[in-house]
Amino acid sequence: MQIERIKGFRDFYPEDMEIEKFIFETASSVAESYGFKRIDFPSLEYIDLYRIKSGEELLNQTYSFTDRGGREVTLIPEATPSTVRMLTSRKDIAKPVRWYSFPKVWRYEEPQAGRFREHYQFNADIFGPSNEEADAEIISLASGILDGLGLSGAYEIRVNSRIMMEDILNGMGIADPYTVFSIVDRFHKVSKETFVDDLMSVGLSEENSNTIYRMCSEASEPGGISGLFGSGKVSKAAERLIRTIDILKEYGVKSVKYDFSIVRGLSYYTGLVFEAYDKSGQFRAILGGGRYDNLAKLFSEQDIPAVGFGMGDAVISLLLKSKGVKAPHAKKSVYVCRVGTVKAERIASISKMLRSSGFIVSAEIMDRSLSSQLKYASYEGCEYAVIAGERDLENNSVTVRDLSTGEQEIVTLGDLVPFLEKSTSY
């Protein structure tokens, strides 16, 4: 009986893991270059961790159950609550705290391109500072990771501020901005008519509803933020966002846009919110995050401002493939072929020597013909074949074949490592 993979979950074959490894290693390397340190936490948490402040929509998407001890638990749907739980459980950690993680997360939602019920998610958070410097640093980190993945110039970062949105909406006479937030969060999923009708259904005038629609319709240059307040005084939240963008310019972060439709659905965000998008518009948000200054208070008596973001592997993987970005190979790969009655011990010795010198080495273990071995080596993506035949080995030599050109040369075992190291075919 053939048992199929569960809907919304993925298998990762070796070629898939190449790009996953590239994403993991690039994100980790860039994060550590900013002074971030890696953490990890359980895949299973008490459901109460998410009941506190994540919102009803997220709770409805959890893989939750009652365990054999009668405890209500869930596979983690996101990383931030677990990260905050870890931080608040200890009081000896100096601020600012720069942490990153790369867990698997689970949400029961409808699978689509770039969205699965299980995925890896890179997360980075800064705890302690409540200022624009931290806001700019976390966005700069996000941009640095995308650049490191070979996506420089292919994306734009869109920013907003929930507090500034409140200021603008209050200026329109809207008493309950959070009701509007939930509608704005669905802006890209509904028609104009539905969007305007939804706003009017919660008490907004038709004029204000259409104004909000226009504000959401197009990302603008940051210089236009002041104009959102008309002839009125620009709010402190707007000044803060402008200041954050100014710092980002000094970080060298380009293509930053202001976007009123960026709200971020999670209810714990308190100020800055941001997302990164592929400029072609082919994919949903690449990453997203913001400031959540009040979350730590919900788990403890500690007041710890925080800002962070999350980046799922699924959309990034699709984007890299669409742009033709391939994972780089840091080491040359070699296949050691065994010909005739050459003993396995000789193959093991040659393989060990090459591995000790930093090469990726696969060796023949199936006693196939040389042509079959070479065909397999090419299939595996090896760059060279080291052919160990009886006659060559009697002279303490092997034949090295460049699998991309077919050229080959007899090389002594003593010269094998430097010969491969100086080869320019890679």
UniProtKB/Swiss-Prot annotation:
Its EC number is 6.1.1.21. It holds the Pfam family tRNA-synt_His. It catalyses: tRNA(His) + L-histidine + ATP = L-histidyl-tRNA(His) + AMP + diphosphate + H(+). It is found in: Cytoplasm. GO terms for cellular component: cytoplasm. Keywords: Aminoacyl-tRNA synthetase, ATP-binding, Cytoplasm, Ligase, Nucleotide-binding, Protein biosynthesis. One of its GO terms (biological process) is histidyl-tRNA aminoacylation. Belongs to the class-II aminoacyl-tRNA synthetase family. InterPro entries: aa-tRNA-synth_II, aa-tRNA-synth_II/BPL/LPL, Anticodon-bd, Anticodon-bd_dom_sf, His-tRNA-ligase, HisRS-like_core, HisRS/HisZ, HisRS_anticodon. It is an enzyme of class 6 (ligase). The lineage of its organism: Archaea, Methanobacteriati, Thermoplasmatota, Thermoplasmata, Thermoplasmatales. It comes from the Archaea. The gene is hisS. This is Histidine--tRNA ligase. GO terms for molecular function: ATP binding; histidine-tRNA ligase activity. It comes from Thermoplasma volcanium (strain ATCC 51530 / DSM 4299 / JCM 9571 / NBRC 15438 / GSS1).
